[in-house]
Amino acid sequence: MSALTESFGPVPSAKSKPPAARKPWYKLLYLQVLVAIVLGVLLGWLSPHIATNEWVKALGDGFVKLIKMVIAPIIFCTVVSGIAHIQDARKVGRVGVKALLYFEVVSSFALLIGLVVGNVVQIGHGLGATGDAAAVSKYVKQAEAQHSVDFVLNIIPDSVVGAFAKGDILQVLLFAILFGFALMTLGERGHRLRDVIDDASHAVFGVIAIVMKAAPVGAFGAMAFTIGKFGPAALGNLIGLIAVFYITAALFVVLVLGLIAKIVGFNIFKFLKYIKDELLIVLGTSSSESALPQLMEKLERLGCSKSVVGLVVPTGYSFNLDGTNIYMTLATLFIAQALGVDLTWTEQLTILLVAMLTSKGASGVSGAGFITLAATLSVVNPALVPGMAIVFSVDKFMSEVRALTNITGNGVATVFVSWWENELDHDKLAAALNKTIDPSDIETAVTTG
């Protein structure tokens, strides 16, 4: 029995029953979200006084909070169930080591690419800007908790209830791993509890299916407020930084992640099309966390092992943030160039090493990349911290691409680790990416079981 069948019931199959009728185009989630984003942009551009109303902003914030509401129970149920179904405890450790090794190698590439592009393009050179420390002081304060020792200690929750209440991914993940191992050691005595957790996972994904119906509303509110508050004219000379970041992130996905996909045996563009719903939701909310539950489910349908999905995806949301990594090195060089500060190669190497640590403190929440940037600058060269105000006004426009790159990177990482573990179902992979299985059937599988 497949991992998906164990979690969500029988999967619709063309061999077992006639294929379901295709949904009308106006009921397709990704089209609804896309239309909502366009309408949000128009409202923010044409009527910024309406778009910046707190109730419009609440539409986007409310949707993200609804998603975050169920992330902790989803991670707990998925990880515990995945580990409890494994008979060999050594396998969990093996998967974890492979995932972390992958994260470090790919994250290093992302950081290095941002550093190289920043030196070649020199987009901040000659700007002659000055920074405003007050504008970014709250981010610097939050960044104080991002140093390596505090980061490690913060993984350990003061209480299990507190970890769930705060929705801290790494704390919930730590408890879930320990609980899963404990359940696995119980043997047959733990089967009933394991089945209860499997059923709970099914129910929580049902909640997600309900919440996702509000995705277009959330995307509309978030995009309208963003455009209304900052507006196209607010970009000014910083449009160059945004363009360079967009192009760099796109090239990273196509070339680096594309090469990894080729090694595994699939096409990166087909993969992007497969997760288009999740990408559009992330685009509207600028938070990769908003698509975490759906991404995990789609990866299982893609043929990835349930145990690998349960371990790699939640961990990747803190340890494998490719878009954030590119942003940190590129933005650091931009700020230094804008302030007229010449960084030596030794200092730039320090940026690379420090960012490898500070980036691990970033979560999938919108704006977390700005906090990790503050952490990096405060360690490398405190004189650069006030310069964060230069990119503050346009950070929101880069946040979306950071989140899109992050979620794509985590998806590819999960497929790669499953392939590395010889637990990737290539038949499912080919069927899903070649549309033999319609991704829209996921909602049916969740809601009907």
From Swiss-Prot:
Chief location category: membrane
Membrane topology per record: Multi-pass membrane protein
Keyword Transmembrane found: yes
Record's keyword terms, sorted: Cell inner membrane, Cell membrane, Membrane, Symport, Transmembrane, Transmembrane helix, Transport
A Pfam cross-reference name: SDF
Gene3D superfamilies (alphabetical): Sodium:dicarboxylate symporter
Transmembrane segments: 28-48, 66-86, 101-121, 167-187, 205-225, 241-261, 326-346, 370-390
Cell compartments where the protein resides: Cell inner membrane
SUPFAM superfamilies per record: Proton glutamate symport protein (SSF118215)
InterPro entries: C4_dicarb_transport (IPR023954), Na-dicarboxylate_symporter (IPR001991), Na-dicarboxylate_symporter_CS (IPR018107), Na:dicarbo_symporter_sf (IPR036458)
GO terms, biological process: L-aspartate transmembrane transport
GO cellular component, as recorded: plasma membrane
Span list, region Disordered: 1-20
GO MF entry, a single one: malate:proton symporter activity
Role this protein plays: Responsible for the transport of dicarboxylates such as succinate, fumarate, and malate from the periplasm across the membrane.
Family (UniProt): Belongs to the dicarboxylate/amino acid:cation symporter (DAACS) (TC 2.A.23) family.
PANTHER family found in the cross-reference section: AEROBIC C4-DICARBOXYLATE TRANSPORT PROTEIN (PTHR42865:SF1), PROTON/GLUTAMATE-ASPARTATE SYMPORTER (PTHR42865)
Protein name per UniProt: C4-dicarboxylate transport protein
Source organism of the structure: Rhodopseudomonas palustris (strain BisB18)
Species lineage: Bacteria, Pseudomonadati, Pseudomonadota, Alphaproteobacteria, Hyphomicrobiales
